[in-house]
């Protein structure tokens, strides 16, 4: 089951902005892309019921996010955890979940 750890980035997306050293970035493009993808998913169900959609969406977003962050930090887990707003142990657990350790 999904580890319901508080995630600073999720909170920042919820309030509609991400603070950086150079200013504020509004993640509207990301939000719009997720909305289109989820809408597309439901349109392809052809009347069938979906289950565990929340878990599926989180996994589909979380895995590439972790991959990109780890590339950006050149594998530095401490830096990656700080960027994500989670502790390093939680990051390790998530990396293991997706086979990225």
From Swiss-Prot:
InterPro entries: Fis_DNA-bd, Homeodomain-like_sf, HTH_Fis, Trans_regulatory_Fis
HAMAP family, per the entry: DNA_binding_Fis
Function: Activates ribosomal RNA transcription. Plays a direct role in upstream activation of rRNA promoters.
Pfam families the UniProt entry points to: HTH_8
Record bears the keyword Calcium: no
Cystine crosslinks: none
SUPFAM superfamilies membership: Homeodomain-like (SSF46689)
Name of the gene encoding the protein in the UniProt record: fis
Quaternary assembly: Homodimer.
Location of the DNA-binding region in this protein: 77-96
Protein known as: DNA-binding protein Fis
Entry keyword Nucleotide-binding: no
Family: Belongs to the transcriptional regulatory Fis family.
Signal sequence extent: none
PANTHER family attached to this UniProt entry: DNA-BINDING PROTEIN FIS
Protein keywords: Activator, DNA-binding, Transcription, Transcription regulation
A single GO molecular function term of this UniProt record: DNA-binding transcription factor activity
């Amino acid at each position: 089951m999904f580890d319901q750890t508080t995630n600073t980035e999720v909170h920042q997306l919820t309030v509609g902005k991400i603070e950086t050293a150079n200013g504020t970035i509004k993640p509207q493009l990301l939000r719009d892309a997720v909305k289109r993808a989820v809408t597309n998913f439901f349109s392809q169900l052809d009347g069938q019921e979906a289950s565990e959609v929340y878990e599926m969406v989180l996994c589909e977003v979380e895995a590439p996010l972790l991959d990109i962050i780890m590339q950006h930090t050149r594998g530095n887990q401490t830096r990656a955890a700080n960027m994500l707003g989670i502790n390093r142990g939680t990051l390790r657990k998530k990396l293991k979940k997706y086979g990225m350790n």
